[in-house]
Amino acid sequence: MSFVLGIDTSNYTTSCALLDTADMRVRSCKKLLPVKQGERGLRQSDAVFHHTKQLPELMKQLFDKKYDISAVGYSYAPRCAEGSYMPCFLVGENVAQAVSLACGADLEKTSHQVGHILAALYSCGKLDML
């Protein structure tokens, strides 16, 4: 039985999930980035800081035991478009690369936007549409 780890570090939420490839069940952990009262968002440097603190905490919750990780997926940018870049995605990318190297797992990247589409397909049981 193997598992796929997914990591997303957007400008709003730190997220990680484990997909059990045997039964396609998902366990996930996520935490909103803290935005001060009256503000509308975060500077990228603040988002990077919060992801750096939150992602290890979430991974600790997710990994309640040792898992055979066969692949690691992560979001590298907001969209699959030339010039689409936000520093906050580097946190997830770096953790994904480290886990992939440590586990000898395949490494796959996608955009945050594609992640939303894949989550919708998974949620409605339509992964066969891929």
Named regions from a protein language model:
Residues 1-130:
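Short acidic/glycine-rich loops and adjacent helix/strand connectors
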